[in-house]
């Protein structure tokens, strides 16, 4: 609501229940249809900015006019949402200041808090296979699966039967495009250009970063085509980086958070972050709590992981790690963090 208010204050006109039906790029006219009363509204334009999501209507309209080189990579895992309701006293049933994960190797459950003292529980599971959504054809099979694999979560889900029956299984995937714009007439941003899986929680933030970058290029460029070309060149490496990190984070969350080597590396990561704040920042922190470009965080994250693996090789406990050698690796391989502006 705050964003809509800000948009209106800046002079934007908002039209609700309007679906992009078609675009005449030759005449520069977009046709919008109200699906409630079937009325159609032609709208002349100078340029179209498509922030209309993974199922973008503008992207579909652009397809005959420019080589989008569109590639969608399905995850082969789907998800179903359940709910932990408030406790009897109206409060949270479990700690709201944490991400709750039930990792099970090839699949997992997570729980995230909501403002109404509920939690949204999401089961991420392969679509096919021995343990998959295909292997849970009915409620009885689903309940038996939870009793076996998520026995401690099931008591938190008193409405499990209703939620499982009513909530659909949805798919996940990553969208890659070879081109985000049609000369100076249209450009895609956000999920319309680079939809990603949700495991880094950065889809919306990435789209907001797109908006800031596009605004800078529109202000500096002499025309729309130059602005769109520069915008895509700046943002593509960052979009590809966060798409890759989101996929990596899924494997980490479901399969590594209870691994001894991983836990030792995470412990050393925190130590090195305290000892070298100008050089070593955990990748998650770089992504979520700084304005470093995603591409920078991705590349530095690779170097940091190499350091952590090398420094902990043959170690069982943090006390076994040669911190002086780890310090030397940090200074030898990691340049100082670049200064960035918000």
Model-derived regions, located:
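Active-site-adjacent segment of FAD-dependent monooxygenases/related oxidoreductases
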Residues: 1-6, 10
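Charged catalytic carboxylate motif
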Residues: 2, 141, 210
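Non-transmembrane alpha-helical segments in soluble domains
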Residues: 4, 143-147, 215, 232, ...
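Conserved FAD-binding catalytic core of PHBH/FMO-like flavoproteins
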Residues: 5, 18-22, 27-172, 176-181
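General small-molecule cofactor/ligand-binding pocket signal
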Residues: 13-15
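Conserved mid-domain beta->alpha element of the FAD-binding
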Residues: 49, 82, 168-258
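C-terminal helical "tail/cap" subdomain of flavin- and related membrane-associated enzymes
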Residues: 216-342
């Amino acid at each position: 609501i705050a964003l809509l208010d800000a948009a209106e204050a800046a002079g934007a006109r908002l039209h609700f229940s309007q679906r992009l039906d078609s675009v005449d790029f030759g005449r520069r006219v977009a046709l919008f249809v109200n699906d409630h009363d079937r009325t159609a509204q032609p709208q002349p334009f100078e340029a179209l900015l498509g922030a209309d999501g993974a199922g973008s209507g503008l992207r579909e309209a652009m397809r005959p006019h420019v080589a989008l080189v569109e590639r969608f990579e399905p995850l082969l895992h789907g998800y179903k949402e359940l709910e932990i309701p408030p406790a009897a006293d109206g409060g949270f049933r479990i700690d709201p200041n944490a991400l709750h994960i039930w990792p099970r190797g090839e699949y997992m459950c997570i729980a995230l808090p909501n403002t109404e003292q509920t939690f949204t529980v999401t089961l991420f599971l392969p679509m096919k296979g021995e343990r998959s959504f295909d292997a849970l054809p009915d409620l009885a099979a689903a309940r038996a699966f939870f009793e076996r694999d998520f026995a401690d979560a099931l008591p938190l889900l008193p409405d499990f039967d209703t939620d499982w029956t009513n909530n659909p299984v949805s798919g996940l995937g990553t969208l890659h495009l070879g081109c985000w714009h049609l000369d100076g007439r249209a450009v895609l941003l956000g999920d319309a250009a680079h939809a990603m899986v949700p495991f880094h929680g950065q889809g919306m933030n990435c789209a907001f970063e797109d908006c800031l970058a596009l605004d800078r290029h529109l202000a500096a460029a002499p025309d729309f085509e130059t602005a769109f070309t520069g915008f895509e060149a700046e943002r593509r490496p960052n979009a590809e980086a966060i798409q890759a990190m989101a996929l990596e984070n899924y494997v980490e969350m479901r399969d590594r958070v209870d691994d001894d080597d991983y836990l030792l590396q995470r412990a050393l990561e925190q130590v090195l972050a305290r000892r070298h704040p100008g050089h070593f920042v955990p990748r998650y922190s770089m992504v979520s709590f700084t304005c470093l470009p995603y591409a920078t965080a991705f590349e530095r994250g690779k170097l940091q992981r190499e350091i952590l693996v090398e420094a902990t090789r043959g170690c069982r406990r943090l006390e076994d790690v040669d911190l002086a050698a780890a310090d030397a690796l940090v200074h030898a391989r990691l340049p100082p963090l670049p200064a960035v502006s918000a």
